[in-house]
């Protein structure tokens, strides 16, 4: 059992550590810009770091759910790879947003694509799971033919 989900667990741990890093950056920015809790406004430099952390936190539960569903029902390796791409894009998003609002955009789009790919893999995996075996075999046969032609 553990071997079947080790990649997913590793990506999950990496994601949690990344979230902790983002939180520590907000704490550091609070000190640097003298913004005491519970305030969430201050200099634009602080607000960008704060917003980047909040935005990343808002999407983290969606990411985790899709990572695990895609990994269990589609393919663990494919889901883990998409998860790593997502986390790297989120790190770049955070770093870009800390510099300027404009610099967050390219990594934001990259992380959105990775997340949508995880959603698609999860949906395909669940669809294949619930399809009758004969229909699933026929669809996979058609897909193989299609892939061999290209």
From Swiss-Prot:
Inhibited by MK886. It holds the Pfam family MAPEG. Pathway: Lipid metabolism; leukotriene C4 biosynthesis. Keywords: Endoplasmic reticulum, Leukotriene biosynthesis, Lyase, Membrane, Nucleus, Phosphoprotein, Transferase, Transmembrane, Transmembrane helix. It is a multi-pass membrane protein. Coiled coil: none annotated. The modification Phosphoserine is found at residue 36. GO terms for biological process: leukotriene biosynthetic process; leukotriene metabolic process; long-chain fatty acid biosynthetic process. Residues 1-6, 70-73, 125-150 are cytoplasmic. The active site is at residues 31, 104. The keyword Protein biosynthesis does not apply. GO terms for cellular component: endoplasmic reticulum; endoplasmic reticulum membrane; nuclear envelope; nuclear membrane; nuclear outer membrane. GO terms for molecular function: enzyme activator activity; glutathione peroxidase activity; glutathione transferase activity; leukotriene-C4 synthase activity. Its main location: nucleus. It catalyses: leukotriene C4 = leukotriene A4 + glutathione; (13S,14S)-epoxy-(4Z,7Z,9E,11E,16Z,19Z)-docosahexaenoate + glutathione = (13R)-S-glutathionyl-(14S)-hydroxy-(4Z,7Z,9E,11E,16Z,19Z)-docosahexaenoate. Its EC number is 4.4.1.20, 2.5.1.-. It is found in: Nucleus outer membrane; Endoplasmic reticulum membrane; Nucleus membrane. Phosphorylation at Ser-36 by RPS6KB1 inhibits the leukotriene-C4 synthase activity. Glutathione binds at residues 30, 51-55, 58-59, 93-97. The chain crosses the membrane at residues 7-27, 49-69, 74-94, 105-124. Catalyzes the conjugation of leukotriene A4 with reduced glutathione (GSH) to form leukotriene C4 with high specificity. Can also catalyze the transfer of a glutathionyl group from glutathione (GSH) to 13(S),14(S)-epoxy-docosahexaenoic acid to form maresin conjugate in tissue regeneration 1 (MCTR1), a bioactive lipid mediator that possess potent anti-inflammatory and proresolving actions. Homotrimer. Interacts with ALOX5AP and ALOX5. Belongs to the MAPEG family. This is Leukotriene C4 synthase. It comes from Bos taurus (Bovine).
């Amino acid at each position: 059992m553990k071997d079947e989900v080790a990649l997913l667990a590793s990506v999950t741990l990496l994601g949690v550590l990344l979230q902790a890093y983002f939180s520590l950056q907000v704490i550091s920015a609070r000190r640097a810009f003298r913004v005491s809790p519970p305030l969430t406004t201050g200099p634009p430099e602080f607000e960008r770091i704060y917003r980047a952390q909040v935005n990343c936190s808002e999407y983290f539960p969606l990411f985790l759910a899709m990572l695990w569903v895609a990994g269990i029902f589609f393919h663990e390796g494919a889901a883990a790879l998409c998860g790593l791409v997502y986390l790297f894009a989120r790190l770049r998003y955070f770093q870009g947003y800390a510099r300027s609002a404009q610099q967050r955009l390219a990594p934001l789009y990259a992380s959105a694509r990775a997340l949508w790919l995880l959603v698609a893999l999860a949906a395909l995996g669940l669809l294949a799971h619930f399809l009758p075996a004969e229909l699933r075999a026929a669809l996979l046969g058609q897909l193989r033919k299609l892939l061999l032609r290209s």
